[in-house]
């Protein structure tokens, strides 16, 4: 679905929701407060007035007890901490605190009232209708692995960035984006695509929110609530704030400049200092006290830094990057002589990144509603632009381009509490989300790309080797549109004795995409030295001969049933089962020749149903040593023990079939050209600049039979037993005071067996070694000497193929595994200090993973072996300190130290002739 159509749908949906139901208070986490009010003789008190006041927003909700003395209050935007007031005619008023201490699904507010001294005549009380307000059910999970993100641990420049917020937590690794793409994060050594992000429980495809939005964000790796799924790594939860009875107006201006930054001369020479200006704000408050609220936030910013390239970098910067100034000067002279543009047509001296985002919520929870109905309308949007995308010593400015992206969404939510005779109470929560995004890149020049290896003698006597790119970009001329429409409903049943909360959750979502993933359409040349570039002796030339334009869609659904069983006031057990499924709208076009040659069905689309059972518990024991701060204040437990085990199932992305759709091996599929050595065409850079259509579509000799010419198509498809990644994971956690109550400690042990990890297997690889290299430990080479270009050493892989009619025939498999073990320790002061606050964390991680030989250059590419993962550091220490100076300035200091990250030098290119 085109993004413009999505925008029209979003606008229409927003208008429809606005007119069909008022945009009302529906908050992000439903706190269900239930209780029974009795007298001293344990007789139920009917018609007692119960009032709950949130401590954070001063929002009030009220209810009347029924004939059995029972009441229910479902609280919008609950914070888990309330002051309760109970009043009844003839009884003394009682005030007490109700607080979530161990992730309780139901907050119990039972009370026993004593009679007043004055005896009154009997009064008949007829219970009235109770009023209830409702909110989204997103309370902390029983596992204890859900950790809130502290705003103080994220720098002002990164505030609101989802990946940066997640990476501020111990045990989470930031995965920086490339070529203008958004960054991601990794947990337990797993890839970022195994994570999921939600906004108020619905799928969220954005990368950031305004920093002043005041969102509540958390990361969970092992939630035992089966209504939460769609990931095998972690789930990052964003909960948009509701307004409250306080009117708030906030503006913030963040300015960062090189004069405020410290670095060494080398970093200064490479342009690593930057200027950042960002303006943000928040408007929040009540439309009607206790009933309707609004919350709107925004952010606009620009980040810029000097564009340091070969054209303007000082000698210090060049030498630091491994290139001598004379080598850089020689390269520039060669490029000018060949008519290759060095800079964009419009001169650029700085690299800019512009961004903007908005987030707003309208809430309504009418006090007079007989069902406690609550409504909410949330909208979000963001836009960003980077120009140029790249910009470094390894790339000429003209080789880059611009990238622009924007996304938006609207979300409507409704919830209501109702009762059905003997079945006690039900809470229904519904969430409908519509979102869309667009991303596109535009290169500065439409011409072939070139890469040259520059070898320099550096002043310290060492040799520096750098690869420099020039010409046109091979990957920026593409675009992508995504759209998503999702529905989530959770129906909760509460037993009369408040021992059980059974949840039935259903989800349905349709994701669609339109992509132009055309890359290298005008070809790319590689040169092994400046002399080769000067003389036009390219080592290789490759080109994609046809565009990669595709579209598709996927429908995903889920149903789950779970129970939160309050065995006692101290022990809660949570268990359930979740079923996920996916179905792609269409599969790749069948190539019958593949079935004949390889016994493979390339038209298969991995549509599956997955089952995920989970079991967790939370046990609190003893009583805390705190002295109650006021009458009715709750005293927490001595400590809380949590744990459990479960299956966490990821779901494939809608674009999963992209490569299989493009690479069927048919004449209508993507075609390519690869030339090595003497078959590389001659270059006419200035002619290609004015006439891109003249770029050669054949190798120099015009033949297709030479071992150094390859026009055979690639093939990609999925094995019949392919399944999405999943993890079997368990944890055990202890949390409580230590050192005579001076500190609070948290100890968590996590073990995860990560199944169905992806890997490709080339069915067209013959596997016969032509010779071995004794000087490299007998490393095998899979092509004969005659298929290795003597001038460059590059190999032509045709000789390693079972069927030369095809190049790589990659079967996507999911038969690899990894194993994650993690110990997490956290320490913070027990007592509150208005001046000084701090916390300290340590994480020990041991992650091992399987890999197939196609990912390396040693042994048989088809073999599978275990290795330590490079994605996780062995040790991590994280600290945060904040100090209040004179009640005027608060300074935060956050640090993250990692050690033990494995590093293995890699080889670029195909050096063993397996074609990869």
Regions found by a protein language model. Give the residues of each.
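Short, acidic Ser/Thr/Gly-rich low-complexity loop/linker segments typical of extracellular
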Residues: 55-70
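A short, solvent-exposed loop/turn motif at the edges and junctions
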Residues: 55-58, 81-97, 171
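Gram-negative outer-membrane beta-barrel transporters
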Residues: 582, 746-905
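Periplasmic N-terminal accessory/gating domains of Gram-negative outer-membrane beta-barrel systems
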Residues: 66-68, 92-112, 121-242, 257, ...
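Transmembrane beta-barrel strands of outer-membrane/channel proteins
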Residues: 127, 251-257, 296-302, 377-383, ...
């Amino acid at each position: 679905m085109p993004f413009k159509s999505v925008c029209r749908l979003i606008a229409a949906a927003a208008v429809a929701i606005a007119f069909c139901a008022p945009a009302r208070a529906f908050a992000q986490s439903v706190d269900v407060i239930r209780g029974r009010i009795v007298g001293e003789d344990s007789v139920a008190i009917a018609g007692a007035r119960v009032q709950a006041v949130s401590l954070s927003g001063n929002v009030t909700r009220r209810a009347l007890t029924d004939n059995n003395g029972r009441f229910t209050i479902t609280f919008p935007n609950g914070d888990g901490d309330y002051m309760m007031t109970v009043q009844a005619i003839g009884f003394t008023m009682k005030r007490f605190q109700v607080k979530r201490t161990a992730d309780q699904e139901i907050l119990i507010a039972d009370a026993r009232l004593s009679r007043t001294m004055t005896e009154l005549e009997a009064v008949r009380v007829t219970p009235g209708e109770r009023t209830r307000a409702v909110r989204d059910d997103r309370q902390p999970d029983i596992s204890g692995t859900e950790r809130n993100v502290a705003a103080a641990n994220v720098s002002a420049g990164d505030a609101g960035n989802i990946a940066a917020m997640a990476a501020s937590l111990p045990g989470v690794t930031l995965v920086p984006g490339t070529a203008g793409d958004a960054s991601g994060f990794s947990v337990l050594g797993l890839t970022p695509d195994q994570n999921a992000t939600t906004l108020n429980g619905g799928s969220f495809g954005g990368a950031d929110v305004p920093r002043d939005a005041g969102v509540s964000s958390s990361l969970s790796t092992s939630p035992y609530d089966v209504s939460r799924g769609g990931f095998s790594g972690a789930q990052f939860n964003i909960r948009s704030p509701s307004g409250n009875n306080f009117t708030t107006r906030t503006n913030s201006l963040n300015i960062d400049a090189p004069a405020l930054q410290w670095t060494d001369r080398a970093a200064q020479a490479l342009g690593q200092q930057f200027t950042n200006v960002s303006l943000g704000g928040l408007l929040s408050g009540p439309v009607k006290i206790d009933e309707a609220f609004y919350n709107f936030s925004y952010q606009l910013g620009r980040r810029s830094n000097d564009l340091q390239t070969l054209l303007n970098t000082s000698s210090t910067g060049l030498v630091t990057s491994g290139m001598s100034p004379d080598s850089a000067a020689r390269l520039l002279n060669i490029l000018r002589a060949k008519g290759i543009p060095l800079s964009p047509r419009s001169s650029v001296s700085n690299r800019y990144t512009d961004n903007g985002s908005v987030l707003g919520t309208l809430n309504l929870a009418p006090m007079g509603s007989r069902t406690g109905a609550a409504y909410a309308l949330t909208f979000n949007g963001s836009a960003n632009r980077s120009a140029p995308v790249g910009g470094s010593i390894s790339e000429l400015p003209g080789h880059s381009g611009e990238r622009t992206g924007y996304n938006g969404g609207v979300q409507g939510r409704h919830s209501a509490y109702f009762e059905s005779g003997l079945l006690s109470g039900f809470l229904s929560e519904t969430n409908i989300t519509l979102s869309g995004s667009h991303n596109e890149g535009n290169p500065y020049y439409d011409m072939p790309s070139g890469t040259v290896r520059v070898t320099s003698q550096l002043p310290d006597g060492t040799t520096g080797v750098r690869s420099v790119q020039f010409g046109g970009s091979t990957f920026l001329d593409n675009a992508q549109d995504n759209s998503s429409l999702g529905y989530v409903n959770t129906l909760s049943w509460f037993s009369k004795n408040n021992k059980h909360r059974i949840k039935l959750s259903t989800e349905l979502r349709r994701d669609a995409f339109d992509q132009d993933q055309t890359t290298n359409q005008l070809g790319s040349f590689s040169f092994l030295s400046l002399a080769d570039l000067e003389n036009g002796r390219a080592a290789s030339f490759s080109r994609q001969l046809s565009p990669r334009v595709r579209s598709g869609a996927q429908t995903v659904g889920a149903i789950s049933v779970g129970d939160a069983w309050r065995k006692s006031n101290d022990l809660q057990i949570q268990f359930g089962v979740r079923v996920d499924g996916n179905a792609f709208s269409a599969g790749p076009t069948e190539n019958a020749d593949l079935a004949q040659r390889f016994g493979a069905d390339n038209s298969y689309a991995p549509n599956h149903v997955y089952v995920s059972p989970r079991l967790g518990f939370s046990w609190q024991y003893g009583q805390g040593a705190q002295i109650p701060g006021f009458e009715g204040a709750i005293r927490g437990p001595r400590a809380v023990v949590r744990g459990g085990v479960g299956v966490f199932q990821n779901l494939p992305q809608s674009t999963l079939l992209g490569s299989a759709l493009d690479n069927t091996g048919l004449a209508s599929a993507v075609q390519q050209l690869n030339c090595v050595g003497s078959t590389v065409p001659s270059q006419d850079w200035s002619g290609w600049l004015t006439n891109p259509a003249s770029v050669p579509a054949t190798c120099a000799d015009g033949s297709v039979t030479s071992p150094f010419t390859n026009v055979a198509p690639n093939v990609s498809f999925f094995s019949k037993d392919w399944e999405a990644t999943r993890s079997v994971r368990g944890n055990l956690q202890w949390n409580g005071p230590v050192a005579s109550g001076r500190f609070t400690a948290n100890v968590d042990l996590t073990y995860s067996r990560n199944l169905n990890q992806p890997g490709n297997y080339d069915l067209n690889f013959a596997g016969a070694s032509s010779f071995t290299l004794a000087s490299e430990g007998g490393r095998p080479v899979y092509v004969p000497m005659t298929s290795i270009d003597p001038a460059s050493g590059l190999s032509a892989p045709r000789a390693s193929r079972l069927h030369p009619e095809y190049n790589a025939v990659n079967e996507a498999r999911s038969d690899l595994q990894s194993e994650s073990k993690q110990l997490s320790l956290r320490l913070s002061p027990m007592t509150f200090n208005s001046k000084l606050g701090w916390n300290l964390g340590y994480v020990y991680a041991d992650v091992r993973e399987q890999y197939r030989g196609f990912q390396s250059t040693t042994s048989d590419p088809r073999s599978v072996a275990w290795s330590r993962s490079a994605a996780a550091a062995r040790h991590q220490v994280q600290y945060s300190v904040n100090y209040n100076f004179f009640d005027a300035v608060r300074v935060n200091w956050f640090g993250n130290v990692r050690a033990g990250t494995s590093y293995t030098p890699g080889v670029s290119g195909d050096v063993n002739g397996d074609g990869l």
